[in-house]
């Protein structure tokens, strides 16, 4: 018997019969591991990639009620990847993407980072985006719920900032394949704040993220959630697909369960990770550019200038000269407790974004 290969499945590229040589320009820039992952998990085949895209494009004529404002190959490809190359499902998602924008025109007026409402939300850390990806290549987004100052930011503007951020991030083909993780820290999120999460705005968020955006969400993780966040499930359940209810995890203050799914080396110290505390202004500086400055020293690490430029080419390089400080009501490093497995087990799936 020959030696047993110990390579991960995504590194066994020699089993692909030379398909890497057939890679189209639409796969250019992807790592070999990601190309293999797309083949195994998403059914992506470079031999028929252009045909798959064209078949989705040919379906557009069936929805004359929708204005499909973008139909180029690279754009349609992200919808195919989000639906594992099921063409009918990919087209349905594409149609819902533009229909959502038609039905919510006010949300997408001046849809750029220097819009006053979006800018305020970004500066306040909605969303946070970690620089490094996790062990599966997924981008990690953070929401510190208690930082929601309702006199400063409307929920709609926070949602707009999240959607704009996803638009920028999804330009990266690696993230189209590997996807995203969302962690929501509910520490000190008050009942009064929660009372503003009405069914109508929750429905708006679910429709925008679950039903109308071409992103693969590998999990949504709740940390330090109070009892009334559990109660929100009864509000959002009617709006959720059955398959999406499996990917949100309620960790409470149990870091062990979180770390079983996301390794500590990829997490900031607020979540028991080995990274420094998260700087709330990091992602705002990335989108708003080098003119976002403050009196304190910081290292400005741009995400990927090409992707930001593609989506936000008309951004003005301006921002108020202040550094967002984490709300005192938000959990600080070391607040969350490590618990033995089996104690206060609180990680039952609740909901997820597909």
Swiss-Prot record:
It comes from Homo sapiens. This is Clavesin-1. Residues 333-354 are annotated as: Disordered. Its main location: Golgi. The CRAL-TRIO domain is required for targeting to the membrane and for binding PtdIns(3,5)P2. It is a peripheral membrane protein. The keyword Secreted does not apply. GO terms for molecular function: phosphatidylinositol bisphosphate binding; phosphatidylinositol-3,5-bisphosphate binding.
